[in-house]
Amino acid sequence: MGCFFSKRRKADKESRPENEEERPKQYSWDQREKVDPKDYMFSGLKDETVGRLPGTVAGQQFLIQDCENCNIYIFDHSATVTIDDCTNCIIFLGPVKGSVFFRNCRDCKCTLACQQFRVRDCRKLEVFLCCATQPIIESSSNIKFGCFQWYYPELAFQFKDAGLSIFNNTWSNIHDFTPVSGELNWSLLPEDAVVQDYVPIPTTEELKAVRVSTEANRSIVPISRGQRQKSSDESCLVVLFAGDYTIANARKLIDEMVGKGFFLVQTKEVSMKAEDAQRVFREKAPDFLPLLNKGPVIALEFNGDGAVEVCQLIVNEIFNGTKMFVSESKETASGDVDSFYNFADIQMGI
């Protein structure tokens, strides 16, 4: 048998024309579309307005460096974004699956959403932020933060493509690696700060094609008060369970409560186990245990005098038939909030 196969191969070689070369093997990685790094960077620009439209970055890494007095808009999701040595720039970044890292930047105004946010060796940044984990600053000063506030039609899908939840936003819970005694290197922007005064909608013909809105009630990310001092000693916790209309119901409830003068303090989307539910929901836990397997829950904290009573009325009138956890009374509500968010912070490693 060995001789037979040997002769067969020899015959094949002899029958092949002399000028016919053997084709190289094709591998799947050879067939991938080649990526030109220049398509995913802005470098050395001055006094320009530039950007990328939805679908043009598609999850790639992006680099912005050595830009001065530029307006930069990335209307797409990306893997990571590094911003180095930029001065007096306006920057918008669509959802970033990983980290956004500012280094040695000055006098920049930004709106962005990401999994991780880090600033090092920077001065005077104003950032409207959605960040899933605790933002970190290092060797930096005069960094100001506000809550992400932005809309365009493709943005919700880009959040999903980047693996980010619009309800996981720790924009105001800042960690300073290098605090200075007696000084504060960061602060919160005024609550009435208008995002368009900092990061205006682009006006160039190409970028105007993206239908942007900065109206608060259209923002993809719910606008929360975060670490600001609460206006009342009464809060109310609402927990919505996974289903076809959970996000829509959460948005509707936020609109109703904010419309009646209450404040949205914080939001969270996280998976719960039975033992977690027992600690948070206590005697009501058995009612919700069957719902935990459907997916993560969404929690909302509202604040204001009468928040518990009004929230109960809205849930009963508008969402009758949809199971939700709502704090029972003003007296128990603060414990509900603490129990849930302590659990959520541990779960998410914050």
UniProtKB/Swiss-Prot annotation:
Keywords assigned: Cell membrane, Cell projection, Cilium, Disease variant, GTP-binding, GTPase activation, Lipoprotein, Membrane, Myristate, Nucleotide-binding, Palmitate, Protein transport, Retinitis pigmentosa, Transport
Membrane-protein topology: Lipid-anchor
Gene Ontology BP term (one): protein transport
Tissues/organs with expression: Ubiquitous. Expressed in the rod and cone photoreceptors, extending from the tips of the outer segment (OS) through the inner segment (IS) and outer nuclear layer (ONL) and into the synaptic terminals of the outer plexiform layer (ONL). Also detected in the bipolar, horizontal and amacrine cells in the inner nuclear layer (INL), extending to the inner plexiform layer (IPL) and though the ganglion cell layer (GCL) and into the nerve fiber layer (NFL) (at protein level).
UniProt PTM comment: Myristoylated on Gly-2; which may be required for membrane targeting.
Effect of Q116A: Reduces affinity and GTP-hydrolysis rate for mouse ARL3
Biased composition (Basic residues): 1-10
The C-CAP/cofactor C-like domain, residue ranges: 24-179
Compositionally biased intervals (Basic and acidic residues): 11-31
Compartments, record wording: Cell membrane; Cell projection, Cilium
Impact upon substituting P95L: In RP2; uncertain significance
Effect of substituting C3S: Targeting to internal membranes. Loss of targeting to the plasma membrane
Record-listed GTP binding positions: G98, S99, Q115, Q116, F117, R118
Positions of N-myristoyl glycine lipidation: G2
Gene Ontology CC annotations of this record: centriole; ciliary basal body; cilium; cytoplasm; cytoplasmic vesicle; cytosol; extracellular exosome; Golgi apparatus
Main location: membrane
Entry superkingdom: Eukaryota
Illness the protein is tied to: Retinitis pigmentosa 2: A retinal dystrophy belonging to the group of pigmentary retinopathies. Retinitis pigmentosa is characterized by retinal pigment deposits visible on fundus examination and primary loss of rod photoreceptor cells followed by secondary loss of cone photoreceptors. Patients typically have night vision blindness and loss of midperipheral visual field. As their condition progresses, they lose their far peripheral visual field and eventually central vision as well.
Biological role stated in the UniProt entry: Acts as a GTPase-activating protein (GAP) involved in trafficking between the Golgi and the ciliary membrane. Involved in localization of proteins, such as NPHP3, to the cilium membrane by inducing hydrolysis of GTP ARL3, leading to the release of UNC119 (or UNC119B). Acts as a GTPase-activating protein (GAP) for tubulin in concert with tubulin-specific chaperone C, but does not enhance tubulin heterodimerization. Acts as a guanine nucleotide dissociation inhibitor towards ADP-ribosylation factor-like proteins.
Subunit description: Found in a complex with ARL3, RP2 and UNC119 (or UNC119B); RP2 induces hydrolysis of GTP ARL3 in the complex, leading to the release of UNC119 (or UNC119B). Interacts with ARL3; interaction is direct and stimulated with the activated GTP-bound form of ARL3.
PANTHER family: PROTEIN XRP2, XRP2 PROTEIN
Family named by the database record: Belongs to the TBCC family.
Name of the protein in question: Protein XRP2
Species this chain originates from: Homo sapiens
Lineage: Eukaryota, Metazoa, Chordata, Craniata, Vertebrata
Gene this chain is encoded by: RP2
